[in-house]
Curated annotation (Swiss-Prot):
Lineage of origin: Eukaryota, Fungi, Dikarya, Ascomycota, Saccharomycotina
Species of provenance: Saccharomyces cerevisiae (strain ATCC 204508 / S288c) (Baker's yeast)
Signal keyword on record: yes
One of the record's GO molecular function terms: structural constituent of cell wall
Signal peptide: 1-20
Name the record gives this protein: Seripauperin-6
Gene Ontology CC entries for this record: fungal-type cell wall; fungal-type vacuole
GO BP terms, alphabetized: fungal-type cell wall organization
Keyword Signal in annotation: yes
Gene name of the encoded protein: PAU6
Amino acid sequence: MVKLTSIAAGVAAIAATASATTTLAQSDERVNLVELGVYVSDIRAHLAQYYMFQAAHPTETYPVEVAEAVFNYGDFTTMLTGIAPDQVTRMITGVPWYSTRLKPAISKALSKDGIYTIAN
């Protein structure tokens, strides 16, 4: 007969090796912060491309928080809280390289953080 403590220890060991995951709505602020973190990093890495896009599309504006985060090389995540989810979606999907560069990077970052999204 197997002792209950042995079963509990086995379950605890399995649970410790499994990655913790969280399922969140796409509009959840934690999802938005991951998306914005990837977005800011992409702007930093491809600044000239974003400047050219901005020049060609002057009505596509960025919240001041995003601009400050791009040029502040410290911890910028607290600057990005409070940006509306629809504005986050508009910014990140509004550039031509969204599906080739941003979407895969966002998916990877969310997965790395154990976050999976569901449609709102």
